[in-house]
């Protein structure tokens, strides 16, 4: 049996109510609407710590901030923390992370070396930015800063589709 593709979408400042599939008649999200019908959709999930870095560290490790130690933004998630990427790799999956990382804690625009990527193999990432148009990122193991062509979310989605 072929293993299913598993895709997580971590949105910043994005409420579920801001989608068509959740019933908002004003917001048009046809691709997300279709994605939601073909996916597991957690409609009653909450964050135990609704701050970017702690929430991302929890999503990556399955641990509460008290365990993984990331209590505020811009704090490094310990390299020894077992991540979802490592678990999927053990299950025979290839892993990719595209977009905002925000658990490195070594500067918002600095290159993140492989040993601080929690096991993700494919990589198109910037630690953190709030510029969503033509922002910088690093790809693979290169420390050369690249730039998305247009609106980041569109280019990042294309990169995920290409992967």
Region spans (language model):
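Formylglycine-dependent sulfatase
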Residues: 1-163
């Amino acid at each position: 049996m072929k293993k299913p593709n598993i895709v997580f979408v971590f949105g910043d400042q994005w409420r579920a109510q801001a989608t068509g599939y959740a019933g908002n008649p004003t917001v048009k999200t046809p691709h997300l609407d279709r994605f939601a019908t073909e996916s597991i959709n957690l409609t009653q999930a909450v964050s135990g710590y609704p701050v970017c870095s702690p929430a991302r560290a929890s999503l990556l490790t399955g641990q509460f901030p008290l365990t993984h130690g990331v209590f505020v933004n811009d704090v490094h998630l310990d390299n020894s923390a077992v991540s979802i990427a490592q678990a999927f790799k053990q299950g025979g999956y290839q892993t990719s992370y595209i977009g905002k990382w925000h658990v490195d804690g070594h500067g918002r625009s600095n290159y993140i070396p492989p040993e601080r990527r929690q096991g993700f193999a494919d990589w198109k990432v910037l630690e953190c930015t709030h510029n969503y148009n033509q922002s910088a990122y690093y790809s693979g193991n290169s420390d050369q800063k690249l730039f998305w062509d247009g609106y980041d979310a569109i280019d990042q989605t294309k990169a995920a589709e290409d992967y």
